[in-house]
């Protein structure tokens, strides 16, 4: 759901919106989870969850009126956080970057997935080499995304952040899952309250620090 009066341009014709996301509980343990999430409307990338925006959990025993009251009591505060988030991305727009900085961000973002790991280069001879960040499926796709982002938006920290986010919002999916609607649902769940939410937030921190 869109939050009233919570839309701002990061740059010309590049609006971002604050949205209230409601996800029902699959196991019926609670009624629903609610988060406030920052979206880029041009490609509908989830940019990041707002700081300290852990999902609100509504128990079935709470009244509807009490739930609504809880939401209304924090919306104004979240609008302030959204404005701060917009300023972060405006700063990224002004940060031109080089290939070495792209490498730095991707290496740090996926450090645990390549560090101290091996890649088999010959199964018959059982030879291996050290794994590096370029071996990762995520990085290969993100590098392709960056070619388009840099062409459209320049070589900026903002373009780098969007190239990473686009992968998690529109491209990630297990190769054994062929149904795109199922892949999209899994991506959404991981982005809202799963491991991908942390990766998206970390990518913003790394790009902002360049």
Where are these regions (language model features)?
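Intrinsically disordered, low-complexity regions enriched in serine/threonine
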Residues: 6-210
